[in-house]
């Protein structure tokens, strides 16, 4: 039996109390953590110690984003479309609308090693959500293509192996993370199970892949982050002192950052979980990779 390394408990870094914190992303150039509050329609940033906490309001819900080569420009995935956002001026440059014919919104996304942005959708037309949303790739030339992956109700856990040959993803309503072969042009093949959640509580949410090829998955409702090795076997576990951890990021020194959410919690639950929606941090034994950046520019 493979040993599970208890990586300790995460502690509160920023008491932001986001409604739906997501999209944790570490920038090695600015030495800062970025994330979103989807339902609060905000982008957030802070330093590794939680200082210099800065929010930016968005014109609609912000679900995901990517760094670019310009530290002051992000690719942002708003609920209905993709755009460039200038942190200095607050200006948006619209790129493309996504799934206008469906009651879906953008959800999770990460860049691949070639600088394309890969993301998935969330159904908002039914409760529980239906598996109708696609997975997409925005190329550096700003063309959009749908990946040949099964549709999802709540697309999540998107990430890539260190060599770029594998893509990870999940539907949060299915308690399993999948992996597929991934080629530079965005071709996907050989979809197969990667890791199944075995605890009685918790659903797979956002993930990050470390330098050693391990995938750190935030497990919504499970109060934990679990690391799965490249073989899909659990190796590490971090307890998170809030009910709904939502997404993960790693810096180059092995610090694990975890966003969380308040949405859906009752007043009694929030009284017992006052820092829900905050950002948490834990030290791990695995360093993060440099975050892949979107290779496109507002000029295409």
Curated annotation (Swiss-Prot):
SUPFAM superfamilies: Calcium-dependent phosphotriesterase. Its cofactor is a divalent metal cation. GO terms for molecular function: calcium ion binding; gluconolactonase activity; L-arabinonolactonase activity. A divalent metal cation binds at residues 22, 156, 205. Binds 1 divalent metal cation per subunit. Keywords: Arabinose catabolism, Carbohydrate metabolism, Hydrolase, Metal-binding. Its EC number is 3.1.1.15. Gene3D superfamilies: TolB, C-terminal domain (2.120.10.30). It catalyses: L-arabinono-1,4-lactone + H2O = L-arabinonate + H(+). GO terms for biological process: L-arabinose catabolic process to 2-oxoglutarate; L-ascorbic acid biosynthetic process. InterPro entries: 6-blade_b-propeller_TolB-like (IPR011042), SGL (IPR013658), SMP-30 (IPR005511). PANTHER family: REGUCALCIN. Belongs to the SMP-30/CGR1 family. Catalyzes the cleavage of L-arabino-gamma-lactone to L-arabonate. Is involved in a degradation pathway of L-arabinose that allows A.brasilense to grow on L-arabinose as a sole carbon source. Can also use D-galactono-1,4-lactone as substrate in vitro; however, the enzyme is probably not involved in the metabolism of D-galactose in vivo. This is L-arabinolactonase.
């Amino acid at each position: 039996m493979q040993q599970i390394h208890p990586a300790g408990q995460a502690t509160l870094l920023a008491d932001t109390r986001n409604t739906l914190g997501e999209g944790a992303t570490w920038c090695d150039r600015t030495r800062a953590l970025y994330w979103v509050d989807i339902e609060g329609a905000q982008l957030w940033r802070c330093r590794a110690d939680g200082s210099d906490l800065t929010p930016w309001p968005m014109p609609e819900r912000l679900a995901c984003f990517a760094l670019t080569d310009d530290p002051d420009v992000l690719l942002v995935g708003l609920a209905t479309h993709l755009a460039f956002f200038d942190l200095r001026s607050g200006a948006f440059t619209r790129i493309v609308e996504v799934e206008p014919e469906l009651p879906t919104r953008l959800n999770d996304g990460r860049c691949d090693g070639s600088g394309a942005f890969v993301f998935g959708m969330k159904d908002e037309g039914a409760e529980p959500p239906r598996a109708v949303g696609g997975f997409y790739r925005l190329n550096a030339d700003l063309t959009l293509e749908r990946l040949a992956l099964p549709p999802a109700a709540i697309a999540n856990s998107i990430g890539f192996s260190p060599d770029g040959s594998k893509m990870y993803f999940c539907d949060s309503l299915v308690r399993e993370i999948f992996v597929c072969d991934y080629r530079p042009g965005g071709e996907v093949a050989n979809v197969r199970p990667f890791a199944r959640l075995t605890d009685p509580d918790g659903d797979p949410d956002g993930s990050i892949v470390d330098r050693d090829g391990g995938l750190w998955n935030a497990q919504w409702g499970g109060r934990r982050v679990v690391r799965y090795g490249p073989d899909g076997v659990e190796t590490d576990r971090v307890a998170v002192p809030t009910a709904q951890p939502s997404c993960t990021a790693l810096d180059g020194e092995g610090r694990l950052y975890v966003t969380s959410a308040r949405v859906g919690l009752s007043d009694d639950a929030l009284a017992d979980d006052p820092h829900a929606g905050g950002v948490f941090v834990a030290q791990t034994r695995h360093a993060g990779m440099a975050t892949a950046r979107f290779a496109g520019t507002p000029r295409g």
